[in-house]
Amino acid sequence: MNEKYAALKSNVSMLGHLLGNTIRDAHGEELLAKVETIRKLSKTARAGSDNDRNALIEEIKSLPNDQLTPVARAFSQFLNLTNMAEQYHTISRHCEEHVCEPDAISSLFSKLSQNNISKLDTVQAVRELNIELVLTAHPTEIARRTMINKLVKINECLSKLELSDISFSEREKTERRLEQLIAQAWHSDVIRQERPTPLDEAKWGFAVVENSLWQGIPDFLREFDQRLENHLGEGLPIDARPVHMSSWMGGDRDGNPFVTHTITREVMLLSRWKAADLYLKDVNELISELSMVKCTDEVRKLAGDQHEPYRAILKQLRTLLNDTLENLDAQMKGELTNNKPILRNAEQLWLPLHACYQSLHACGMGIIAEGSLLDTLRRVKAFGAHLVRLDIRQESTRHSNVLSELTRYLGIGDYDQWSEQDKISFLVNELSSKRPLLPRDWTPTAEVQEVIDTCKIVAEQSKEALGSYVISMARTASDVLAVHLLLQEAGCPFRMDVCPLFETLDDLNRSKEVMEQLFSIDWYRGFIQNHQMVMIGYSDSAKDAGVMSAGWAQYSAMEALVDVCEKESIELTLFHGRGGTIGRGGAPAHAALLSQPPKSLKGGLRVTEQGEMIRFKLGLPEVAVNSFNLYASAILEANLLPPPEPKQEWRDLMEVLSEVSCEAYRNIVRGEKDFVPYFRAATPELELGKLPLGSRPAKRNPNGGVESLRAIPWIFSWSQNRLVLPAWLGAGEAIQYSIDKGHQELLEEMCREWPFFSTRLGMLEMVYTKCNPQMSEYYDQRLTDKSLWPLGVRLRNQLQADIKAVLNVENSDHLMESDPWGSESIRLRNIYVDPLNMLQAELLYRTRQQEETSPELEEALMVTIAGIAAGMRNTG
């Protein structure tokens, strides 16, 4: 590894050495020697030695079944430890340029100053700053919570070892602790034995809040406040709420039959319980700190005649929180609850705590007010009384099925067979009516009843407990109105954001037309109060049309929605359903946000954080602070220094690129007769369905083919065999087509001057760097019928041609020239991922030869899947 990454190299080497000790102790010198032989052969094979590559293949083929799992685990664990060392390095004091993000906020203020942006405009943009991260339980988080907790403790040890004044005995003790943690991880089961329930997933999300965000958000706000003070002369108002959290865990029932209304209710109770539990810890700490006597009349009034007024108020809060925990416990167990007052909204915490804060300032104790008390006040604004706001997500046809069954029962026809205009007339008429629509004597089918019961659960909650109701596969205005009607019929007493999710290429292209139709309806305009949320689907659009075409459709849809909302004086919040991989919209946060259309971040940012990306971006408080800094600086920059409007010739060329890339993508995925058999044979797609990752089935329709596969297993499968097909197919071909048509200069101009286009090419470069055509060929030879080999050859040839086309436009000699650290990081991992790929191909071969599944082979296969996911730094 390059010497400028010496501190990171040292940590990786130390962790690898300690892992080696653990393997020796657990399995003996012989197995460790075998692992080391494979590692060395992988390294020399990577350097270009065909002899060593063949030797590596033979070494892996010759492994007996009982050695497959420990060898796979050795490489998998090393990659997990490397990820931890790398994540730690980004926040360590030894972090080098190109590895760590520069100070994003300070860089932003320099740019604002250079562009003469006024203080007034900047202050206004800061006041409007809104970052809402939505934690989702997509089944991409391979690592079990058990393993994640151990990795967090390893991070703490690395932090201690970095201290320059650490004593020899303390260093020895910390290194010993590291070795213990690595041994604990080795002897723990790396793979879940059972598929997690939706409740397990929600608990995982709450653990992220407790272990990282509970500290990370107030830390970010404290740092951000100081930067604003330094640059603008005024900090964040005490009641500012620039960051808040939502969740889909326990609310996302799209294609997941296990998320029922009962589960949603249970998750919401658990969310409140966890919030009360965390606030109780804060309050207990404040009781120990705030022993002051002097106070204002307001605090004296709240405290009564107690000698220590602040403690008296805090003890009242402690009683409230204890009673809340007791009440929620009883509710979760289905027992009778007490009638004592409990925490129901954030104001119950805010008012007494804020009174204490103001009193301390008024009495000359501002320095005390600005300590732990301020952090707790910031938490009250960020997390409320419910920790996270829960979104509800359901597929559009589930709502129309309710109305169809109902209208047939009422004898007025079949709603599903009506024209769109007839549906809208019926829905608006019912929404405007004061009489109920649902008859008392109607007994719906179980599926329909579940949708109705979900709406009733929503109606029982407080508004601040809920985010938005997301309609997946939204296609028409009636899809949105139908949800409003069902919520109204359930007795929902507040206005809930109903958010259409436009996912496919056609739906994205029609999104403006759908919203214009909704805005033309008087009832709808009156109800939404000039605020609209729309969700842009990244994963399904890319699966439908390929990344280039989907990317342009997403951009065009955002632009059109911004335009129509501006004309209608409606405040638009765009909700981005991004994933961790390029094929699902993943990109470095800062670049991705700055590549969006002008004005698309005016209403703030709402974005899903999914699976393993939650851990990479938010898993440690310090890492979360970095992520929030990047989000905040990008949103402020996009709003104060918007990117250029694309020139007409750029748009025209993007239309061509989109059309050509979509056709190229679909010709393979839909038009190639051998594609589905090839996909099933050359990737672990069928085996992945057995992996106990998330609570949600891998297919929307269990009997369907590729088209019914969810976007996550679709991309996950291709990432495993290193062809990563969905993240590049069609894009390079379209670029080469445009070069051949004489547009190279225009492409180069777009690359230089248009953030949208340059970000797309940067994402492609990263994907190409992670691809391994040689490994994909090995999977073909080991696993597929010879009749399918020509398709594999064709795809790999296309990949090589695409790489040349992109490098040509960028005037680069090799991939990721502008990101040497990213390239180096991938190179380092490849030495450990390659043996896992070869092991996986061998395991798939052996498994598919057997009539009955061998638990031994299945376990080893699961370990390789987890290891490759860790090495690729993204799954689905």
UniProtKB/Swiss-Prot annotation:
Cofactor: Mg(2+)
GO molecular function, one term: phosphoenolpyruvate carboxylase activity
Keyword Lyase: yes
Active-site residue numbers: H138, K543
Listed PROSITE patterns: PEPCASE_1, PEPCASE_2
GO cellular component: cytosol
Root EC class: lyase
Reaction equation(s) it catalyzes: oxaloacetate + phosphate = phosphoenolpyruvate + hydrogencarbonate
Alphabetical keyword list: Carbon dioxide fixation, Lyase, Magnesium
GO-annotated biological processes: carbon fixation; oxaloacetate metabolic process; tricarboxylic acid cycle
E.C. number(s) listed in UniProt: 4.1.1.31
HAMAP family (UniProt xref): PEPcase_type1
Cited function: Forms oxaloacetate, a four-carbon dicarboxylic acid source for the tricarboxylic acid cycle.
Name used for this protein in its record: Phosphoenolpyruvate carboxylase
